[in-house]
Each structure stands twice: as structure tokens, then as C-alpha cells.
């Protein structure tokens, strides 16, 4: 019979840890939180210093019964939930439910699930950290005070099922503010002049820079013509050649935020999916003869540091695989963000020796892709900087200056393993110039002016929104993914081509929130609240005072809102179409994900239809219907025939009104981030989109 009981959150984690601890230990899972505030009432006693009234979560009774029974049979119980606020709170609730003294050495924490980390953790158990618990409790109580008071108000004044929260409301505001910027944007005209030149028949490109040594902006076609009129002949003089060596340093290992951003950019993963896969890699994967192994460190962190052991192992790996010149020389200082809690390491593989190829047969495709990203990022972070040779050349003709820039990799360093992605999806390539020297003459081959217009700021992608939230101090590693998930589930925003757009419902709710609860939407207020929660965790402030300072002002605004907030009637709009089932008029209604079409004879007729957008292309299958843009249940855009179900044509890619010149099948637009290519739906024909 076992002497010790270890309680973790999940069966996967229990299985991995159980393998390392041996027969004297029984490892069981609590399946997450066992106690929480009740759903049916506020659960916070405002008169009794905001005391939370916790109850056993529905369905957790049998779990607690099993844990209590197991606890009675052992000498000692260890609580080994995750090493953060949420994990500390789970441990505290378990201690309360199992009558364990929270001041006893019952808490065990580890940053990775490996044999050595588990052994070390069990050598130094500690009491439950009540500062961590209080920080989690303060967040929970704050969110309950806001949500439980404002949500019913929104149900009453707008529609049922709505909710309001501190962080989610600010995220919605950011998306709506960006949409307003886009709508208010007035494009400005500007021009550029691209020149193709040649030295001894070797072509290269340069851009117009200015005149008489000064930079000049081209605002109109007249400006362009004035510049071109100055040029005489095809010969340009090489005025200057500047050659420099530039170092490019590797990026740090992943934090939660940077992992979500990079997985979105490189793998097209949503934040929620990234965290689900990371959790699986952290809790343990069955590696055959090796058994179940935790492959990465804890995935909720805002730290970029790694342990000395991990540094040494990674350096040794780099030297053996790439050579000593590729290993980082000296210790790179880790810049600590003032918002970083830094309680953990960065996200890294638990062993750099487990390269992605060695795990291919044990991981799913998406698990492997995410692991590869994490592994490459760690290795690259400990490698030498890349060294680039850069060259800047100025060419002139009658005082008209063109500038050419080139670069090539002299020493790849970390770039041999990993290059960070960017939101535009552009690939970095060498830009090579001929071996130009001052005083030489080059020949102009072509001059091509181009008209451009300034572009509005882009809508937020998940990656960009997470990055901006992090920069502003809104939310913490554990809250980014749930926040993005919630604002979509509530129907306040939707994703259009992987970018957030506000819904009419989101705009209505934000307008009410702005009028009656402006402080909840204030970025600085929300960021300060996060800092206050951090200070509670550090033992510098009492959680009750933080809550009280917030609630005094909030309570006053709540009273005003209850009296003055007017009901918002979201009226049905006529569509001009008749219901094909009963003959009544179809109307536009507001639903969870925005507008849809429904019969005005509801509830007698329950006919509903999505709002579809014709794209001006005949159906290539039945040749009778029109192709329309639709959205799947997961909000992904696809294209189908408007004669469905008679015609079942469907395509994820947008068909265009041309046939393939090679096989006569229909052509589609294939989108990859910002690149659009025309491809055949049947054969290998491709062409660049105009």
C-alpha cells in the first residue's frame, strides 16, 4: 500500500508523474478546480470584507469523495497543481476540502515534468503560498463583481446571454476602436520611382531617393514628371558606396504571449489551439519504451530566462551539431519586463536532445509542429548572432539621386536554425548588388513610376491583439487565450480572414459600457489593476483593500446605470425576400454571431437562412446557380452554389470567372497570408493574381 498521495489536475499529468515517483506514491487527478463561486448567485459577501462563498463544483462530488478516501489511507498528502496563481488556488481549495493544514509542507511545485525536476520538487515541499492564493482570489472576486452586476443589466436592456468582464471589455474596445480608425481613414496619394540599372550587363534595382542630396517625397504624378524631366541620357554616376557589417541577435525563448503570436504567424494556430497543444506536451506524451515524458516546461509564463542546466545542455548540443563558432559566446543578458512575474522559466523543451525528428512517430502532426517551433526557438536563442554584409549605393544623373541597398548573410549564426516570423508573412531573402565602386558609371535600363495610396491600420489578428494586450499590460499569460475565445463566443466580434471585426451587438454593448462604466474600458485602469494583482502576489498589498477601492466607485456607477440605462431595441429589418416555406416576409435578425435571415412568422414558421454574398461567378458544376460566400459553424469562409441542396458544389478557395487554359477546369484564388495566387482546382496550373 502507498504511503503518500499526490494530487494533480489532470489524468495525463498524474500518469507522467506516477511513473517517476514509484510504488510508495499514489497519484490522482482533481480534474481542475473542485470549488468555485456559485453560478446561481453572486457568491461574494460585500458586507463581510468581500468574503467569497465557495461551493463544490457540480459533478466534483465523486472526485472529492475518492480523494478523501485515498487521503485517509496514507501518511501524507502532497498537492502538486500547476506552479502559478491558479494552481496555488486549486491546492488551497483541495487543502480545505481534505482538511489539510495549509501551513504544513503540503505543496509541491515544478516547472517541468521530468524525473530530476519531480525528485527535486519532492525534496523541498512548502506551505501553500497565501499571497498567490489571494491574488487569484482577488481576480476571481473582481471578475464576479463586474460580471454578476453588469451582465443582468445587459440581459435586461439589450438581450439575454450577454456578459461583461474587465479584460474582455477592453479587448472588444480595442477591436472597435481600430475599426473606427479604419472607417475614418482618408488615403493619401504618393508615388515611387523604381529604376533598373546595369553594370557590365549585370542588372540591379534602385529606388528614387531625392534631388541634390536631399530626400524628396513624391506626392503626385506632377512631382514624378518634374523629376524625370531632369534626367539626361542613360548613364548614372556612382556617387558613394557604403559597406557595413551588421549583427543580428537571436530572439529570446518563448513566453506564453510570444508562443501564441508565432504559432499564429507560422502555423496558423488560434491561441486556444496553441495552449491546448502546449498543455499536452507539458503534461506528458507516451514515447514508447521511454514511457510517458513531459516534453516542454510550463506553458503559462512571461519569463524569457532559462535555467543554467538548460543553457549548458543547449550549448553542448549546438557545439556538437553545428560547431563551436555557432554557440553563443558569453551569457546574453535577459531583459526583464517590468510586467513580468518571472516566477518560471521560458517555454522550452525539457531536453534539447529530443529533436523534433526523434519524436515524429509519437506526436500528432500539430503537436510536432508546435514542439518543433519551441525546440528551434530555444536552440536559436543560445546561438551566435548572424552577421550580415550590407551595401548602400547612391547613383545620380543631373542631381537626381537613386539609392540601391543590398545585403547578404556572411555568417548565418542562429538563422541556420530559426528566423522569427512577421505579421505580413514576408520571407527574408538576400538582396545582392554587383561589385560597385565609387566613380563608376552604370546604365539605366528602365524607369518605372508607381502610384500608391496610404493604407489604413490593419485589423487585429489574434497574434497582433495578444501582442498589443501584453504591451499595454492588459491580462496575463493565463488570460489571453480565454479572453479571445470569450469575446467571439458572446458574438461581440467575429473573425474575417483571420482578422477581428466587431459585430453590431459588440458595438451596442460597448456604447452602453462607455456611457456608464468608462473605467472598466480604460486601458490604464485595467493595466493598473493587473499591477495591483501582481503586488498582492508579491505580498505588498492586501487583496481586500484593492477590491474595496474598486467597488466603491463601481457601486455608484451601477446605481446610475440601473436607473438611467435605456433599453436597446434591436429591430428586425425587412430583407425584401419572401419565405419560401410560408410566404411571409423574411427579416434580418441579430443573433449570437451577427445578423441572419429569419421568417417574420416566427414561431409558427422557423425558417432561417444565413446571409450570403454573391461573388459574381456562375457555378462551375451546375452552370445554373451563382457562387455565394458562406460561413461554417466555426466561422470559416467557404464558397457554395446558391442552388443548394439541388447542387452540392463547395470550395474553401474562391472560384473566379475563368477556366484553366491547361485543362478547362475552374480556377480559384488561393490565399496564403498576404499573397494571392490563381490556381487550377484540378491540375497544377498556377499564375500570379493581378
UniProtKB/Swiss-Prot annotation:
Releases the supercoiling and torsional tension of DNA, which is introduced during the DNA replication and transcription, by transiently cleaving and rejoining one strand of the DNA duplex. Introduces a single-strand break via transesterification at a target site in duplex DNA. The scissile phosphodiester is attacked by the catalytic tyrosine of the enzyme, resulting in the formation of a DNA-(5'-phosphotyrosyl)-enzyme intermediate and the expulsion of a 3'-OH DNA strand. The free DNA strand then undergoes passage around the unbroken strand, thus removing DNA supercoils. PROSITE patterns: TOPO_IA_1 (PS00396), TOPO_IA_2 (PS52039), TOPRIM (PS50880). NCBIfam families: topA_bact. GO terms for biological process: DNA topological change. This is DNA topoisomerase 1. It catalyses: ATP-independent breakage of single-stranded DNA, followed by passage and rejoining. Residues 163-168 are annotated as: Interaction with DNA. It comes from Halalkalibacterium halodurans (strain ATCC BAA-125 / DSM 18197 / FERM 7344 / JCM 9153 / C-125). The active site is at residue 298. A zinc finger (C4-type) spans 579-605, 619-647, 660-683. Residues 329-354 are annotated as: Disordered. Its EC number is 5.6.2.1. The record marks 33, 139-140, 143, 148, 155, 300, 490 as: Interaction with DNA. GO terms for cellular component: chromosome. Transmembrane segments: none annotated. One of its GO terms (molecular function) is DNA topoisomerase type I (single strand cut, ATP-independent) activity. Mg(2+) binds at residues 9, 82. Residues 3-121 form the Toprim domain. Residues 129-558 form the Topo IA-type catalytic domain. It comes from the Bacteria. Belongs to the type IA topoisomerase family. Monomer. Its cofactor is Mg(2+). Gene3D superfamilies: 3.40.50.140, Bacterial Topoisomerase I, domain 1 (3.30.65.10), Topoisomerase I, domain 2 (1.10.460.10), Topoisomerase I, domain 3 (2.70.20.10), Topoisomerase I, domain 4 (1.10.290.10). It is an enzyme of class 5 (isomerase). The gene is topA. Keywords: DNA-binding, Isomerase, Magnesium, Metal-binding, Repeat, Topoisomerase, Zinc, Zinc-finger. Pfam families: Topoisom_bac, Toprim, Zn_ribbon_Top1.
